[in-house]
């Protein structure tokens, strides 16, 4: 990392190493084709940028596996349009505001990028990188962590790191349970909190997500129909849990979103706990 005026011929160095310039502008991305590193930030963030540069080069850098201590919160749509994506983004923003290094993304097939002003690479690109890593043997966990870290971007307002949604629903079709496990294990090594939004359609991928998550939250829209669909999902998970090994015990909660004067709560099974209601505001400025 160099001062620009002290390195008049950067191309002499960039052939053999990853080169970057110091910057005093927080949002500067490139200078004369070279990456920049913001000078006035925590040493840990500067180190993160070094890791990103090493991952982009893809060779000549020793990698190491970071300990997977991050905790995962999974939000599942109990019914279509229940607002689980908004609840996910709100949870991630709250955790980031507490000073936790937080990553947020959605695994929904047909989601749009409406939660954060700044997002990283799409989940389609993430899926491709995991696929390439597996083709190369899938052994070097540190290399995958560095690659994924380089694909994250931090939102200025909320300070949440995120990936953008899948480019097309067809991309998400090929994201299987093994890919999800690879993704979660890598992400848990580069953040303190990982907040994920997923469709409520039962699949091997969703069951793998629930097993890997520290907390799972079902989001209902507080209508009679939405509660019925959420109840069916909970009953299905209970049935799977009785046949499988402790899929849901002790970590399943329910949020009643858009709760107003006509809002309703479903009777929860004993293994699930109510986490509260999110009011339906009529005024946009209060939302």
Name each region found by the language model.
Residues 1, 15-23, 34-35, 71-73, ...:
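Hydrophobic beta-strand segments of well-ordered beta-sheets in folded domains
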Residues 1-6, 22-25, 40, 76-79, ...:
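Structural motif
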Residues 2-3, 12-72:
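Extreme N-terminal, non-catalytic leader segments
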Residues 8-15, 25-34, 208-210, 264-271:
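Short loop/helix-cap segments at secondary-structure boundaries that form the rim of catalytic
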């Amino acid at each position: 990392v160099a001062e620009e005026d002290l390195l008049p011929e950067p191309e002499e160095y960039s052939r053999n190493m990853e080169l970057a310039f110091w910057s005093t502008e927080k949002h500067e991305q490139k200078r004369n084709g070279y990456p920049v590193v913001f000078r006035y930030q925590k040493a840990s963030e500067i180190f993160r940028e070094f890791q990103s540069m090493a991952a982009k080069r893809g060779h000549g850098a020793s990698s190491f596996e970071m300990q997977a201590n991050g905790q995962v919160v999974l939000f599942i749509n109990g019914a279509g349009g229940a607002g689980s994506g908004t609840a996910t983004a709100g949870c991630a923003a709250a955790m980031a505001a507490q000073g936790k290094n937080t990553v947020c993304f959605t695994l929904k097939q047909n989601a749009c990028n409406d939660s954060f002003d700044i997002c990283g690479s799409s989940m389609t690109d993430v899926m491709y990188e995991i696929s390439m890593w597996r083709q190369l043997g899938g052994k070097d966990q540190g290399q995958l962590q560095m690659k994924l870290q380089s694909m994250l971007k931090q939102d200025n307002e909320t300070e949440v790191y995120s990936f953008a949604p899948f480019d097309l629903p067809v991309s998400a079709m090929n994201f299987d349970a093994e890919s999800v496990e690879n993704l979660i294990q890598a992400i848990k090594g580069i953040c303190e909190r990982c907040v994920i939004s997923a469709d409520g359609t039962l699949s091997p991928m969703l069951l793998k997500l629930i097993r890997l998550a520290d907390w799972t939250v079902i989001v209902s829209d507080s209508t009679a129909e939405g509660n019925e669909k959420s109840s069916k999902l909970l009953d299905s998970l209970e049935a799977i849990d009785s046949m499988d090994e402790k899929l849901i015990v002790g970590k399943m909660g329910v949020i009643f979103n858009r709760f107003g004067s006509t809002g309703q709560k479903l009777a929860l099974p004993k293994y699930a706990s109510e986490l509260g209601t999110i009011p339906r505001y009529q005024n946009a400025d209060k939302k």
